[in-house]
Structure formats: structure tokens, C-alpha cells
């Protein structure tokens, strides 16, 4: 019995504890990201932001959660009720399981698999299904149009995201996310410089992937009322809301891993090694999240034709050219990694 426990049950308990240790702080981070967004945008617009519930408004996310929890869930009469309820759950769950392969510090990762990049790409591709199901099951033309927009937008920018990731794989030689970070420790400065434009393209692409300004066309209030979640209330709306912000944190962590060295000190400065890698990871993710909020506060929304033109006529040719350029330079300098 003891042997059975240590061989089968104990590893499952450890995995469950790791999942809880990642999920609960992440949900808290999502809740307080909404608070940070309102405060940052308030300061940029010369107003206070939330400041009533608790000291400095710090309990506002909890008040919002309690309000949504006790609201009545309203299901439209002619909707597909099972899919209508299932859609926000799919979106929220997919936004959490992507974290399984993200390394928070050296050796601190839930599943250190050799195909972590493929796993992340698969999860990001699946996330559109929750939105499409929500738009179709709501039996509303506004929700359906928002879902169609979202699917077209995400497919368009996933192409350029994939090509950008290929340039990273060419320079690092591994699909393991921890391996990508460690490869950046010894990467020549000129390769970092060559990847910089792709880092900018990747960040703009994930803005579109997460439906954030200036690419929030699926939720355009002036055109589609509220987009694919227009018929949702109570916890259904809350799960979509949590999923969107959890995806923001996830894509910031991906950008940090691919282009900013993950848990490594900035510019690989050796005398900063005494600071834990987890601190640097959180600092870099926090900086990128601030960029998300800054962009929302300052940029107007693109028209839909401008959004598509940027994805297919600018980013796709640029990333294709850059893959060829990086490959040629690496072959010429004998730095091509064997993926």
C-alpha cells in the first residue's frame, strides 16, 4: 500500500499542489490587473480612478467579483443553452492551461516539456473556439458578428506570430521554453539586435490576438454593442473577462520568454545574478502589461480593413523576409542551431 501511494498517488498530489500554486496567484493577478488598468488609465486622463472601496480602492476587484457572483445569470430564450454556458468556461480554462510550460525561474515550471513552443501555439489557436461558440450559441447578430471578427483577426495574426517564433527557434535551437531562455544567456549581441524588430512585431500581434486596443474590433461598442459577450451576464461575463486578462498576462510571459530573456537579469549583467530570477520575470511581465495599458489609454481603434491590411500585407511579408534573412545570416556565420 505504501509503495502504491509513493509511486502513483503522491506524484498526483504534488502536481495538484503545483496547479493550485499557479492558478490561485494568477486569478489574484488577473483581478488586480483590472484595478491597475483603471488606476493607470485614470492617471493618464488626469482623474483618480477607483478610490472608494478599501484603502486606495484596493478592494475594488473583490467588490466587482462579489457583484458579478450574485447577479442573476440570464440565458436568451432562443440560444443553445448548453453551448452558451460552455463557451466562457472553455475560454477561461484555455487561458489557464497555457501556463503549464511557462518557466517562472530556473527549474520552476509545471511541465518542462521539449515541445513547449508547440504546446503554447496549440493553446493559443484553440482559444478562438470559446469566442466562436459564444457568438453562435447566443443567437444574436451582434454576438455572431463579433465572433466572426475575432476568429478572422486571430487567424490573421497567428500566421505572423508563428513566423516570428520560427526566427527565435532558428537562433536558440530548441522548442523547450527553459532552453530558449538559457540560450539567450550566451547569445551574441548582434543576434539579439536582429531579433528586436521581430519582438516588436510579436508584441503587436499579441495585442491583436488578445483583442486589445487598438485591435479590439470584436468588442467595438459603437458598432457591435459589446461584441461576442453581449448576451452574457453574471459569472458567464466574469469568466470571459477573467479569460481576456489571463491571456494578457500569458502573452506577456511568452514575449518575456522569447525576447527579453525570461528570468535572466537585463542585458545578462552578471553582478545582478544575486537577485532571484522570479523577480526579473515578474518585473519584465509587469513592464509589458503596463505597455498594454498605456496603449489602451493613448491609441484609437483601427478600422477593420486597416487591421487586416496590417496583418496580411505588412506583417506576413515582413516576417517571411525576416525568416529568410535570419536563416541566411546564421548559415553564413555558422551560428545556425539544430532544432
UniProtKB/Swiss-Prot annotation:
Official protein name in the record: NADH-quinone oxidoreductase subunit H
Q: Which GO terms describe its cellular component?
A: plasma membrane
Reported EC number(s) for this entry are: 7.1.1.-
Subunit text: NDH-1 is composed of 14 different subunits. Subunits NuoA, H, J, K, L, M, N constitute the membrane sector of the complex.
Q: Which PANTHER family match?
A: NADH DEHYDROGENASE SUBUNIT 1 (PTHR11432), NADH-UBIQUINONE OXIDOREDUCTASE CHAIN 1 (PTHR11432:SF3)
Q: What is its main location?
A: membrane
What is known about what this protein does?
NDH-1 shuttles electrons from NADH, via FMN and iron-sulfur (Fe-S) centers, to quinones in the respiratory chain. The immediate electron acceptor for the enzyme in this species is believed to be ubiquinone. Couples the redox reaction to proton translocation (for every two electrons transferred, four hydrogen ions are translocated across the cytoplasmic membrane), and thus conserves the redox energy in a proton gradient. This subunit may bind ubiquinone.
- Catalysed conversion reaction: a quinone + NADH + 5 H(+)(in) = a quinol + NAD(+) + 4 H(+)(out)
Where is this protein found?
Cell inner membrane
Family under the similarity heading: Belongs to the complex I subunit 1 family.
Offer an example of a GO molecular function term for this protein. Answer: NADH dehydrogenase activity
Q: State the annotated membrane topology for this chain.
A: Multi-pass membrane protein
- Residue ranges annotated as transmembrane are 9-29, 50-70, 82-102, 115-135, 161-181, 187-207, 235-255, 275-295, 311-331
Biological process per Gene Ontology, one example term: aerobic respiration
> Gene behind this chain?
nuoH
Which enzyme class, named as a word? Answer: translocase
Record key words, sorted: Cell inner membrane, Cell membrane, Membrane, NAD, Quinone, Translocase, Transmembrane, Transmembrane helix, Ubiquinone
- Where on the tree of life does the source sit, at the highest rank? Bacteria
The record's disulfide annotation reads none
The UniProt entry, under InterPro entries, shows: NADH_UbQ_OxRdtase_su1/FPO (IPR001694), NADH_UbQ_OxRdtase_su1_CS (IPR018086)
Q: Which Pfam families match?
A: NADHdh (PF00146)
Amino acid at each position: 500500500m505504501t509503495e502504491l501511494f509513493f509511486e502513483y498517488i503522491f506524484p498526483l498530489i504534488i502536481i495538484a499542489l503545483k496547479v493550485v500554486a499557479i492558478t490561485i496567484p494568477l486569478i489574484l493577478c488577473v483581478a488586480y490587473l483590472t484595478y491597475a488598468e483603471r488606476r493607470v488609465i485614470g492617471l493618464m486622463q488626469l482623474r483618480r480612478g477607483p478610490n472608494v472601496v478599501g484603502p486606495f480602492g484596493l478592494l475594488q476587484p473583490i467588490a466587482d467579483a462579489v457583484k458579478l457572483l450574485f447577479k442573476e445569470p440570464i440565458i436568451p430564450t432562443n440560444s443553445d443553452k448548453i453551448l452558451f454556458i460552455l463557451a466562457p468556461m472553455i475560454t477561461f480554462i484555455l487561458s489557464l492551461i497555457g501556463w503549464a510550460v511557462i518557466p517562472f525561474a530556473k527549474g520552476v515550471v509545471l511541465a518542462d516539456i521539449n515541445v513547449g513552443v508547440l504546446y503554447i501555439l496549440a493553446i493559443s489557436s484553440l482559444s478562438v473556439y470559446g469566442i466562436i461558440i459564444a457568438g453562435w450559441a447566443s443567437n444574436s447578430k451582434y454576438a455572431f458578428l463579433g465572433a466572426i471578427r475575432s476568429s478572422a483577426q486571430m487567424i490573421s495574426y497567428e500566421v505572423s506570430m508563428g513566423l516570428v517564433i520560427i526566427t527565435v527557434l532558428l537562433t536558440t535551437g530548441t522548442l523547450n521554453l527553459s532552453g530558449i531562455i538559457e540560450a539567450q544567456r550566451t547569445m551574441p549581441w548582434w543576434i539579439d539586435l536582429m531579433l528586436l524588430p521581430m519582438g516588436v512585431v510579436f508584441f503587436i500581434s499579441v495585442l491583436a490576438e488578445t483583442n486589445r486596443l487598438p485591435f479590439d474590433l470584436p468588442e467595438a461598442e459603437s458598432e457591435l454593442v459589446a461584441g461576442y459577450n453581449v448576451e452574457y451576464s453574471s459569472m458567464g461575463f466574469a469568466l470571459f473577462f477573467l479569460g481576456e486578462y489571463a491571456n494578457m498576462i500569458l502573452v506577456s510571459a511568452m514575449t518575456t520568454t522569447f525576447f527579453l530573456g525570461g528570468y535572466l537579469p537585463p542585458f545578462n549583467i552578471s553582478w545582478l545574478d544575486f537577485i532571484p530570477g522570479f523577480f526579473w520575470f515578474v518585473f519584465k511581465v509587469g513592464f509589458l502589461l503596463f505597455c498594454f495599458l498605456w496603449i489602451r489609454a493613448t491609441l484609437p481603434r483601427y478600422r477593420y480593413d486597416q487591421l487586416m491590411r496590417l496583418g496580411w500585407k505588412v506583417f506576413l511579408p515582413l516576417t517571411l523576409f525576416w525568416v529568410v534573412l535570419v536563416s541566411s545570416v546564421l548559415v553564413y556565420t555558422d551560428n545556425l542551431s539544430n532544432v
